[in-house]
C-alpha cells in the first residue's frame, strides 16, 4: 500500500514537471482529453457524412482524397470549403495545378472574395505556405490540389530527363512530420487531393497507387477513394455523374463504408436528391408510384419535381436533414425514445425498423 502511494506521488510529481516544462495539456489521462469529441465539417454530401461516421471530416487532421481524372475530387473539396465558410470558418486553397476555376467555385457556393488562394512555384513553397497558415492559428481549412503537382525545387531547376528518384516522397515525408503536430494544435483541417498511377508489372492485386510516397497514407486520418460509376442523362444530354466514395481509411470511426451520390455539372453534389433517396429508404418520405409525400402531404410527382419543391422550401429540406443526421449518426436505444425532440418523434412514429 505504501509503495502504491509512493508511486502515485512520483507520478503526480512527474506530471506536474511535464506540464510546467511543456505547457498544460501536454500530457493527460485519455478519458480527460477533451479532443476526444472530434469537431467535424460536412463534406456537402449527407451520405458521405454518414459513411464517415462522425458527420464529416475531422478538424485538426490530415485527409487524403484520391481518384481517377474527372471523378469529382476538386468538386468535393470545394463543397467542403462552402460548408466551412457557411459556419464562418477561414479557408485556403493551395492550387499547385494552377487550374482552379473561380466561376465554378462560386456556383458551388464558395465565397471566393474570402477564399485565400496560392499558386506556388515549387512543392517546398506550397508545403511551407501550408505550415505558415497552420501555425498562424487563423485558418480552419486548407486544400492542396494536388500532391502530384507538388514538384520539388531540384526537379524544376534541373533538366528534363534528369533522375530524381524518391525526391517527392522525401519532401512529403518531411512535411508530414512537421505539419501533423501543428495541425492538431491549431485545429486545422488539411486536405490533400491526390492522383492515381499504375504500378508496372503487377500481375495480381490492385495495380493502382497514389503519388507522393507512403508518408501521406500513414499520416492521413481519413482516406477517400472517389470514382465516377455512371452518367446522369436528361434525354440524350449528359448532365452529371453518379459518384461513389469509399472510406478506405478512417481513424475516427469504422472504415470501409461507402456513399453513393450524384454530382451535377455546374451545380455540384445533388444534396436534395440525397435527402429524397435517404428519406424514402428510412420511411420519412412516402413513395406511392411516382408521387412523394411528407408528413401526409403530397410534395410532388417524380423525383425532379420533389427536388424543386425542396429547393423552394429550404425549411422542409433542413428538417429532413436534421432528422436523418440525428437518426443515422446518433442512434438511440428504445428506452431513450421518450426523450426525443418532436422532429425525432416523427421518425419513430413513421418507422418500424431501425
UniProtKB/Swiss-Prot annotation:
GO cellular component, one term: cytosol
Keyword field: ATP-binding, Cytoplasm, DNA damage, DNA recombination, DNA repair, DNA-binding, Nucleotide-binding, SOS response
Keyword DNA repair belongs to the record: yes
Record Gene3D superfamilies: P-loop containing nucleotide triphosphate hydrolases
Superkingdom in the source lineage: Bacteria
Protein name: Protein RecA
Main location: cytoplasm
List of residues binding ATP: 67-74
MF term (GO), any: single-stranded DNA binding
Swiss-Prot/TrEMBL GO biological process terms: DNA recombination; DNA repair; SOS response
Family to which the UniProt record says this protein belongs: Belongs to the RecA family.
NCBIfam families named among the record's database cross-references: tigrfam_recA (TIGR02012)
A Pfam match: RecA
SMART domains documented for this protein: AAA
Subcellular localization(s) per the UniProt record: Cytoplasm
Role of this protein: Can catalyze the hydrolysis of ATP in the presence of single-stranded DNA, the ATP-dependent uptake of single-stranded DNA by duplex DNA, and the ATP-dependent hybridization of homologous single-stranded DNAs. It interacts with LexA causing its activation and leading to its autocatalytic cleavage.
Cited CDD domains: RecA
PROSITE patterns: RECA_1, RECA_2, RECA_3
KW Endoplasmic reticulum (keyword) present: no
Amino acid at each position: 500500500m505504501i509503495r502504491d502511494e509512493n508511486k502515485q506521488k512520483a507520478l503526480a510529481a512527474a506530471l506536474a514537471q511535464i506540464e510546467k516544462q511543456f505547457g498544460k495539456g501536454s500530457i493527460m489521462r485519455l478519458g480527460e482529453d477533451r479532443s476526444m469529441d472530434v469537431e467535424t465539417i460536412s463534406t456537402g454530401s449527407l451520405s458521405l457524412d454518414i459513411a464517415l461516421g462522425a458527420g464529416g471530416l475531422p478538424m485538426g487532421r490530415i485527409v487524403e482524397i484520391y481518384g481517377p481524372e474527372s471523378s469529382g475530387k476538386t468538386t468535393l473539396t470545394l463543397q467542403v470549403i462552402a460548408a466551412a465558410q457557411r459556419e464562418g470558418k477561414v479557408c485556403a486553397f493551395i492550387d499547385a495545378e494552377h487550374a482552379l476555376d473561380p466561376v465554378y467555385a462560386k456556383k458551388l457556393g464558395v465565397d471566393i472574395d474570402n477564399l485565400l488562394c496560392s499558386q506556388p512555384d515549387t512543392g517546398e513553397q506550397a508545403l511551407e505556405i501550408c505550415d505558415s497558415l497552420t501555425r498562424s492559428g487563423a485558418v480552419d481549412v486548407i486544400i492542396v490540389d494536388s500532391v502530384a503537382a507538388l514538384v520539388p525545387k531540384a526537379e524544376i531547376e534541373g533538366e528534363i530527363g534528369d533522375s530524381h528518384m524518391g525526391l517527392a516522397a522525401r519532401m512529403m515525408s518531411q512535411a508530414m512530420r512537421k505539419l501533423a503536430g501543428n495541425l492538431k494544435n491549431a485545429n486545422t483541417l488539411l486536405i490533400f487531393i491526390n492522383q492515381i498511377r499504375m504500378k508496372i508489372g503487377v500481375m495480381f492485386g490492385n495495380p493502382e497507387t497514389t503519388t507522393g510516397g507512403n508518408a501521406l497514407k500513414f499520416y492521413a486520418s481519413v482516406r477517400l477513394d472517389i470514382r465516377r460509376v455512371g452518367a446522369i442523362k436528361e434525354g440524350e444530354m449528359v448532365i452529371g455523374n453518379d459518384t461513389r466514395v469509399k472510406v478506405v481509411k478512417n481513424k475516427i470511426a469504422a472504415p470501409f463504408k461507402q456513399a453513393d451520390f450524384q454530382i451535377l455539372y455546374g451545380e455540384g453534389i445533388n444534396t436534395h436528391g440525397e435527402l429524397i433517396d435517404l428519406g424514402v429508404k428510412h420511411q420519412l418520405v412516402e413513395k406511392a408510384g411516382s408521387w412523394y409525400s411528407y408528413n401526409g402531404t403530397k410534395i410532388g410527382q417524380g423525383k425532379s419535381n420533389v427536388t424543386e419543391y425542396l429547393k423552394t422550401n429550404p425549411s422542409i429540406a433542413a428538417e429532413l436533414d436534421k432528422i436523418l443526421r440525428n437518426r443515422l449518426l446518433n442512434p438511440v436505444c428504445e428506452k431513450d425514445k421518450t426523450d426525443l425532440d418532436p422532429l425525432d418523434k416523427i421518425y419513430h412514429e413513421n418507422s418500424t425498423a431501425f
